[in-house]
Amino acid sequence: GVPCRCDSDGPSVHGNTLSGTIWVGSCETGWHKCNTEHNLFHECCKQ
């Protein structure tokens, strides 16, 4: 999947590890949304 930034990754500066994965729609079962950003068509999710 496409990596995305979770709140726990810290501020989005170059070089940070992106620990989330973008899911279209909402997060897969067993995953949870890991940031506070509001996106219309996808969520940044983490297992």
UniProtKB/Swiss-Prot annotation:
Keywords: Disulfide bond, Hydroxylation, Ion channel impairing toxin, Nematocyst, Neurotoxin, Secreted, Toxin, Voltage-gated sodium channel impairing toxin
Signal peptide: none
Disulfide feature: 4-44, 6-34, 27-45
Keyword Secreted recorded: yes
This protein's record includes keyword Transferase: no
Superkingdom, taxonomy of origin: Eukaryota
GO molecular function per UniProt: sodium channel regulator activity; toxin activity
Listed GO CC annotations: extracellular region; nematocyst
InterPro entries listed in its UniProt record: Myo_ane_neurotoxin_sf (IPR023355)
Positions carrying Hydroxyproline: 3
Main location (coarse class): secreted
Location of the protein in the cell: Secreted; Nematocyst
Similarity section: Belongs to the sea anemone sodium channel inhibitory toxin family. Type I subfamily.
Function: Inhibits voltage-gated sodium channels (Nav).
Other notes: A synonymy between H.magnifica and R.crispa is controversial.
Official protein name in the record: Delta-stichotoxin-Hcr3a
Organism: Radianthus crispa (Leathery sea anemone)
Taxonomic lineage of the native organism: Eukaryota, Metazoa, Cnidaria, Anthozoa, Hexacorallia
